[in-house]
Amino acid sequence: MSAAIAATARPAAEMRTRALYDLPLPELMFRAQAVHRAHFDACSVETAQLLSIKTGGCPEDCGYCSQSAHHDTGVAATRLMDVEAVLAEARKAKAAGAARFCMGAAWRAPKDRDMDAVCAMISGVRALGLETCVTLGMLTPAQVDRLSAAGLDYYNHNVDTSPAYYPRITSTRTLDDRLETLGHVRAGGIKVCCGGIVGMGETIEDRLAMLELLAGLDPHPESVPLNMWTPIDGTPVKAFEEKVDPIAFVRLVAVARLLMPRSVVRLSAGRHTLSDEAQALCFLAGANSIFVGDTLLTTPNMEESRDAVLLARLGLRPAPAQPSA
């Protein structure tokens, strides 16, 4: 589906989504929890850990990102990590209870010369019994084939925001560029991890249009990360950031669950700003995945000890790893 088609989504569908969002909270939560229980174990939460394998120096100008070479954020550019160093971090993640190991590189697109190392990382992490996910930027079909052959389970490539708001966030690529890569990933047999970010000055309508865009992908993404933008000095978005109301975020999670019943909905960046009570509401609304570990690329995350206490308080248990066959 192109961005042009997404931008002209049927008004009736948009009205239905807004009507869901505006339901009295108890009714919205009841509907979302019912759908969630129809497809998932309501007491199981997926745990993933994210490692930046190549930080900073990205040529894209994404207004929310600390790793863009266009912004003065104090993030130093690094080279691609050695394979063994990545595998050492993956072992630590597994020992700490993570079921999926996600690796992110600050590239517009990977160079073919880097693919051998990335594929070795994927194969090595998979050999540890962990699910694998990478986010490397835009891909060619040939690169997708290499990642698939290495055993990659998931590829993350977010749509970021609504089609209408997208040009305000970045100018070095289009939403159609993102959707093209998602098409390559899907055609290559790799599961899709695709979500977005809220709190960048967008409207409620933009947030819901983003969910409509995700729900319009056929099939739905297997994994949908929902991020709350974390303030980063030196980024353009810092000038018009908006703190997301926790209840508004809970509503967004519930609508995501209703629109994409079989997708795993992940509480991603910004989760550390939510109280335990707000996170509990998110789980009731249908969220069933979290990032563990103290950092997400270059931004803070929940402390591991706080996560363990929270899951225990709520009676939730980490889901086991399920690498693709």
From Swiss-Prot:
All copies of domain Radical SAM core, residue ranges: 43-262
Cofactor stoichiometry and binding remark: Binds 1 [4Fe-4S] cluster. The cluster is coordinated with 3 cysteines and an exchangeable S-adenosyl-L-methionine. Binds 1 [2Fe-2S] cluster. The cluster is coordinated with 3 cysteines and 1 arginine.
Entry function: Catalyzes the conversion of dethiobiotin (DTB) to biotin by the insertion of a sulfur atom into dethiobiotin via a radical-based mechanism.
Keyword Isomerase assigned: no
Origin species: Azorhizobium caulinodans (strain ATCC 43989 / DSM 5975 / JCM 20966 / LMG 6465 / NBRC 14845 / NCIMB 13405 / ORS 571)
Protein's name in the database: Biotin synthase
Binding partners and assembly: Homodimer.
Family as reported in the entry's similarity comment: Belongs to the radical SAM superfamily. Biotin synthase family.
Positions that bind [2Fe-2S] cluster: C102, C133, C193, R266
Keywords on record: 2Fe-2S, 4Fe-4S, Biotin biosynthesis, Iron, Iron-sulfur, Metal-binding, S-adenosyl-L-methionine, Transferase
GO BP, sorted A to Z: biotin biosynthetic process
Cofactor: [4Fe-4S] cluster; [2Fe-2S] cluster
Top-rank taxon: Bacteria
The keyword 4Fe-4S appears for this protein: yes
Substrates-to-products reaction catalysed: (4R,5S)-dethiobiotin + (sulfur carrier)-SH + 2 reduced [2Fe-2S]-[ferredoxin] + 2 S-adenosyl-L-methionine = (sulfur carrier)-H + biotin + 2 5'-deoxyadenosine + 2 L-methionine + 2 oxidized [2Fe-2S]-[ferredoxin]
Cleaved signal peptide residues: none
